[in-house]
Amino acid sequence: MRPQLVAAFEAHGHLLTRRQALAAGATMAEIDHWVRVGAWVSVRRGVYALREFWDGLDEWRGQPMYAARAASAAMVRPHVMSHDSAALEHGLEVLMPKQSLVHVTRPGVLGSRLERGVKHHKAPYRPEQVVTVNGRRVLDMARTVADISRDRGLDAGLVTADSALRAGVTRTQLAEAVARMRNWAGVTVARDVVDLADPGAENAAETLGRRLVTDLGHGRPDTQFGVTDGRRRIWCDLRLGRHMFEIDGWLKYRPTDRGGLSSDPERTLREEKQRQDFISGFKLGVSRIVWADFWGEARLRALEREYLDTCRRWGTSIDDLTPFLIPARRLAG
């Protein structure tokens, strides 16, 4: 492949429209050839990426984001990126569906509609809600949280809302975005999201874990609960009474040569066991939650049993732990 074509991809953010490729010196025959042999990926009709670049993108964030950029590049009518597509541009966490869609909001569109993997939304927006991110016009973070909440429900809304609060958006800004949506479809879910959002959840798994623990019906758990014995400091993901809920991601136990984060899995397991023993030493119960637990009724019942067992053994008050508590971290929101 000619160097000027590779340079053209880099100059245009790793995506080339057919017109841009022709302007860079490619011929129609060359474009068809590179697509046919697999060196170029047709991300969208008339929009291409180099195979090596595309395959290096992860399927949950990178590829959906560039698919949205490609769809935007192929559109001739005015639009702004919105919903999941806007969240990805902002760097917010998104609970991606199995089949991701490109989302745009267009002025004057009569009714939302799905067309070749692009969902066109009709909801009006104010000029000040449009910001430029990575050279693209997108709806701002607060509006994006509200849109995802209305369109995709409480879990997806909370994941993005928690992420937005961590990024510096205030709860007041979220509330203002939702307040402008009076009588819109799904607005009650968006209001619930504003109320329940918590920047203490450090990732999507902790957000969903908080939702799971809340569903036990014993109140909202505290996030990022810290204890120390004067030498060691431990932060627990969630606390309800005297019971801690720790969110486990399997990547931290998986060897690095299998795509994980641990260079020594046995040591990682040993350190995690020592960590749990340290927590239990304060007469605190501990439950562990993994991703698969978020949608299982059986696991919800098991967590209920574990929580109630802690209550029977040690009660719910943590007044005796006052000398050992670490002041709460300063968090946005």
What are these regions (language model features)?
Residues 1-186, 222, 308-333:
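Short gly/ser-rich loop at a beta-strand->alpha-helix junction or flexible surface loop bordering the NTP-binding
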Residues 3, 7, 11-12, 27, ...:
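Surface segments flanking catalytic/ligand-binding clefts of nucleic-acid enzymes
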